[in-house]
From Swiss-Prot:
Provenance organism: Sinorhizobium medicae (strain WSM419)
Name of this protein: UPF0102 protein Smed_3545
Superkingdom of this protein's organism: Bacteria
Single Gene Ontology MF annotation: nucleic acid binding
Family under the similarity heading: Belongs to the UPF0102 family.
InterPro entries per the UniProt record, alphabetical: Restrct_endonuc-II-like, tRNA_endonuc-like_dom_sf, UPF0102_YraN-like
Amino acid sequence: MKAERSDDLKLKALKRGHLAEYRAALCLILKGYRIVAMRYRTRLGEIDIIARRGDLIACVEVKARRSFDDAIFAVSSTAQRRIRAASEVWLSRQGDFHRLSLRYDIVAVMPWRWPRHLTDAF
């Protein structure tokens, strides 16, 4: 019984996270970004969204929280290191990597509000 509840909670959290990522992607598209990848995984880490506008690559961490501050502070230094490591792997696989600039952003997704995009967050 307890394992079933735990599994249900994990599934609910996973669905909430995926929905938050799609809302964040829509926010970025409306701001003029092109979504290059979602949930990009390497053995070193994962990037929720990789978005591009011109020669700028934004590696975006999406956090679904009740408040903007909660979302920002939820990105730990360990998570930042993993995102940076994964972004280096992604960047090295791009043919035009030499002309691309990289930036790390956070999109905070809060209930009943439009997602907030914090550029150059870390």
